[in-house]
Amino acid sequence: QRQMCIRDRITTMFGNGGIFCWYSYVTPLMTHVAGFSENSMTFIMVLAGLSMTVGNLMGGKFSDQYGAARVVKYTQVIMASGLFAIFFAASVSWLAVILMCICTAGLFAVSAPQQLLLLRNSRGGEMMGAACVQVAFNLGNAIGAYAGGLPIDAGLGYRYPALVGVFIVLIGFVAVSLYSKRESASLSRI
């Protein structure tokens, strides 16, 4: 059970951290690469917020239908794919906005099932589990922002944080895949 809690934290930290690699630098990407004006960023951020709300609702609903681990796993695939597409398509303004909405929806679609997994694996210490999921989320935010800034500091440009984010999300994907394999094996023994 302790290994599963650690895996849940890794899944949360890196799965979300990959999005923060890119999202921490979304304004310069949208203004310098996609070609939006600074004034349009308010509306673009409203779209990101609406996407987060929709993603949160979808993540909870799909977790009830398909299971939390499965939702986390597939949502992280969508997030990694969105980040990969952003790397290549950020200069197409309308596509950059659509991909932003997909990634921000994914960021919040994955949150409820991640919390559910951590609470489920924290039996007897649910309050500590709830605190740990928030710590993991915040660490992911910090790690993602730092890692996303490295290619910018190296002069590679504002597309590259998304590419770094792909690899970080994939770490979370591997962790949740190991969890879901173990969960499937334990269910098949019942």
Where are these regions (language model features)?
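Short, small-residue-biased leader/transition segments that mark boundaries at the very start
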Residues: 2-6
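Helix-to-loop junctions at the C-terminal end of transmembrane segments
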Residues: 55-68, 152-153
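A late C-terminal transmembrane helix in Major Facilitator Superfamily
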Residues: 120-158, 165
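Residue-level signature of mid-helix packing/kink "hotspots" within the transmembrane helices
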Residues: 49-57, 141-142
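Multi-pass alpha-helical transporter architecture, strongest
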Residues: 166-190
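C-terminal transmembrane helical hairpin of 12-TM major facilitator-type secondary transporters
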Residues: 69-114
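Extracytoplasmic gate region of multi-pass secondary transporters
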Residues: 7-46, 50
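Small-residue hotspots at the loop-to-helix junctions and early N-terminal turns
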Residues: 38-46, 127-131, 162
